[in-house]
Amino acid sequence: YRAGPRYIQAQVGPIGPRGPPGPPGSPGQQGYQGLRGEPGDSGPMGPIGKRGPPGPAGIAGKSGDDGRDGEPGPRGGIGPMGPRGAGGMPGMPGPKGHRGFRGLSGSKGEQGKSGNQGPDGGPGPAGPSGPIGPRGQTGERGRDGKSGLPGLRGVDGLAGPPGPPGPIGSTGSPGFPGTPGSKGDRGQSGIKGAQGLQGPVGLSGQPGVAGENGHPGMPGMDGANGEPGASGESGLPGPSGFPGPRGMPGTAGSPGQAGAKGDGGPTGEQGRPGAPGVKGSSGPPGDVGAPGHAGEAGKRGSPGSPGPAGSPGPQGDRGLPGSRGLPGMTGASGAMGIPGEKGPSGEPGAKGPTGDTGRQGNQGTPGIAGLPGNPGSDGRPGKDGRPGIRGKDGKQGEQGPQGPQGLAGLQGRAGPPGARGEPGKNGAPGEPGAHGEQGDAGKDGETGAAGPPGAAGPTGARGPPGPRGQQGFQGLAGAQGTPGEAGKTGERGAVGATGPSGPAGPGGERGAPGDRGNVGPRGMPGERGATGPAGPTGSPGVAGAKGQGGPPGPAGLVGLPGERGPKGVGGSKGSRGDIGPRGKAGERGKDGERGERGENGLPGPSGLAASKGERGDMGSPGERGSPGPAGERGPAGSQGIQGQPGPPGDAGPAGTKGDIGFPGERGTRGATGKQGARGPRGLAGKRGLRGAGGSRGETGAQGEIGLPGSPGQPGLPGPSGQPGPSGPAGTAGKQGVKGARGSPGLVGKQGDRGSDGEPGRDGTKGERGEDGPPGVSGPTGAPGQQGERGMPGMVGLRGETGPMGGQGMKGDGGPPGPSGDRGERGNAGPQGPTGPSGQAGAPGQEGAPGKDGLPGLAGRPGERGEPGVAGRAGSQGLAGLMGQRGLPGAAGPPGDRGERGEPGGQGVQGPVGAPGSQGPAGIMGMKGEAGGKGAKGDKGWTGLPGLQGLQGTPGHSGESGPPGAPGPRGARGEAGGRGSQGPPGKDGQPGPSGRVGPRGPSGDDGRSGPPGPPGPPGPPGNSDYGA
């Protein structure tokens, strides 16, 4: 049984022998069912308060205070439910729903709120509860609702409702007992809308919250050797949003809110069936037929045949079961609907509005893509985590409950048959004609022709059940939000602007670009590549694509000469690596294709960012040297070759400007690049190593400067060229030696991407190499961001849901169920504490003591004492639910009686079972109403429901049920053609009408027939309470 709060049952003082049932009194007010505590950790089961002497019961032969004097005490209200202990331990099995009255379908209650959104976009809104189907058939006995323990059985009038004995919390239902299948989730048949009066159609449920998206898997860690780590597993899908609680059936007791379908939280407790809906009264009798024309004199009009009584409307379909309740939350059982009074006759019931259709729950949003794996030690980016599993779509809203059928107008009672009309006096004989023929006899007064008896107004057929609410349209699946575009990586391009610093590029000319190939050694700066880890920023590297602007970057290339490498230190830009988070946008990075743009060369590193798109893996594509294309630019690098004038390499200091080539700074991002592990991707840079260019690299020092030279051609850098004079910075070019850091040159490996450029080898080497450093940034970036995603890995938290597995504990409870046997002792329950002793066990047999057994609840401690106490687990004894079955036994009888109501009181006796309840083992006792005998004690768990058997006193409510029953009878009965014929009777007045007399018969008969229906009366529902 899903975890649900248990209702706290107060212990009841020993119950004296049951007195003879008192005369039925008006049904005692049914105690309110204790509110269900919020699910909390199941608190320790507080001692169960002793059950006070049972209050006088309601009509059901009120149980005597102690039963000794036989005076039924007033039925005590059900004690407040203790707060639900944390942990939402499953409540004791709810009372077994009594067979719901065939009432109108309850309106669907509003949908429960959707679960909170989880960190990863927690559960989506619960799917709307579908409208409840058309009025349910006479509800079968509701499955044992997985309601929390029924509120204390007021029947025994909790002695001063023993407050909740220590809040039993959800009876601190041990763990979530595994759903012992507390009677199976059958209880899930949601709350069976008691078919009480047809409630107004509930609003259609709100669309359920879409299930949470699964968290994206964590990115795999890169392998030690730099192999991309395995991608993180996809995050578990977020739990689906809980479906909104099922709407309450109309006036029928509100069903517990169906919890969202959670991990299969307990289903809301079954709402008590509402009182039988009023049977739609027959429609008003048909108009009386106009009196027939006088027939031939003397002929009496034949009495009209009574109109057929309207057939009762078809029984509505059974309401759909409510969706499974949220875990732990059992909906409070709805109060039993009051049986509808018989509608005044003659008024046709309006047809109830059709229930709104539930909306379909939104689709769960797609899980976030897994973060890119962290780069391995070799710097290779780990594989991106798998995208989180897409959250489950919210359930499709259930069909809205059928609009309540309008009560059929009560059938108008047939007016009493009109007095038979005096036969029209025969006209005086006509004067004899001249021929002496007697004048024609005066025509008899026209017999008022009995109009055809007014057809009994068709019994107001119940309106056809209101059409089922159209099935809620499925709400459009919440459109999956398109993944936010990966935020564009902060345009590193801006850095590219730095490229304009490139003007230093002219100095770049200095760098013979070919030497740039040396830049390949710059790959050393590739160490910056380490910065490359900043590369995560590189995710922004996508922006790096803008880095294409980077081409000015090439001016940066000037700087690129290892200068950039220092910039790699600039890796602070790696902070941009933070931008890298935008790299999430990096998904675009998937556009990794863009990474291609990265090919634009420096941006190519951005291309790495494109890798970002890959979420790392793509980053690898970035390695693809999207920069490679940049490599093509590399040919421009060849221009760098022009740079071979590299001697201007002195301008290399301008290369420092190359530093300006913030792109290099991007390299700084590289600093961020710790992620730069990707920088290792730069290994691709190794390709750069391929960098035959590497050899150039030697030239590199100059070349480095020179490389920018290529950009220098852009000439814009030319101005920067002035910085060229900085050529002393060319010394910085030595920094280019830092380029030697080029080990990061591995970054240069990223240059490999450049390698793609290899075709442009000259450029490839040079520019790409340069790009490579940026690439470092880029690649890094991708990982960085994704690494962040790694956070989602948290989703694993859902694992917490695992506790639900705790419910599995219920199974444990099951064993306590056996303890329930001890529950017999539970009967001894008062001693229940002693319950372990079970000494009173024999008394438990006494049953009445069994009530004492309620103390047996204290017996729960007994449960503890006895395994029964374990019975708390016994609560889990939900297995005891089986006990509920027992309950049904107990409740059943009371239930039926429940209709009688008073017998329901006997249901109170059910309490003996209650003792079963007591020992939660006692609850088993319930089963044991037999459990009173204790043996059933196990079932006694169920017995708690047995307490509900006490609730059977609610059977009084059952009495209410009877009214419902009458409703049906009355309704049709009235219709019993009487009314119909009545009108004809009047017509009959013309003597001939007298014949109409026949109508009378039909009238009464009509009535009688309908009563048959009463059988369905919900009172058993009351017994449900009892249950």
UniProtKB/Swiss-Prot annotation:
List the keywords (alphabetical). Answer: Collagen, Extracellular matrix, Glycoprotein, Hydroxylation, Repeat, Secreted
Q: What residue spans carry the region label Nonhelical region (C-terminal)?
A: 1024-1027
The entry's localization annotation reads:
Secreted, Extracellular space, Extracellular matrix
Tell me the Pfam families matching this sequence: Collagen
Keyword Magnesium, does the record have it?
no
Any idea which residues bear 5-hydroxylysine here?
96, 108, 183, 192, 261, 279, 342, 351, 546, 567, 573, 612, 657, 738, 765, 810, 927, 933, 936, 939
Q: Where is the composition biased (Gly residues)?
A: 73-91, 259-268, 502-511, 802-814, 973-982
The answer to keyword Amino-acid biosynthesis applying to this record is: no
What residue spans carry the region label Triple-helical region? 13-1023
Describe its function. Fibril-forming collagen.
- The name this protein carries in UniProt is Fibril-forming collagen alpha chain
What organism does this protein naturally occur in? Riftia pachyptila
Q: Tell me the organism's taxonomic lineage.
A: Eukaryota, Metazoa, Spiralia, Lophotrochozoa, Annelida
